[in-house]
Amino acid sequence: MKKPTTKRIFTGATQIAALGALAFLSLNVSPVFAATLSRSVDVSATLAQVWSMIGPFCAIQDWLPPVGTCRETGGSPSERTLVTKDGKATFVETQTARSEAGHSYSYTFKSSPLPVTAYASTIKVVPKSDGVSTVIWSSTYVPDLGKEQDAREALTGIYEAGLATIKAKFTK
């Protein structure tokens, strides 16, 4: 009996993969892809000044306009519950990392009304120049199928509103 050659094995594997892909596509199922978003703003303040304002986990209620209240559990890991000013939306977020030295924290959504899953975000402050800092808000998430644009627009609006408020608080 003749051993299959590498070419034959590769050809057979390629055919199986192609058939599998065709079967997957014929089911009208689309693969899930993670999306990323990052926004930043330069602020006329020192790193320490900016971090003291935005660093506490529940300080978000002071710089994110839609947030009416923030309640922090204080456990480990810390959780916060955000309720919008109109009371119509609630977000529960878990802090997953925090670095006072790195002037950053990361969090995930435990529950959210936004059309996303697997949301993970980081807010950090970095020095830019003398008396100027940059606030960076970034995330990865999986948008709900058919809601990709809605998810991106909602998150972009949230990030831009928050960053604009941070900048305004330090504008002289």
Explain the meaning of each model-derived region.
Residues 34, 77-79, 102-104, 130-134:
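A generic structural signal for beta-strand entry/edge sites
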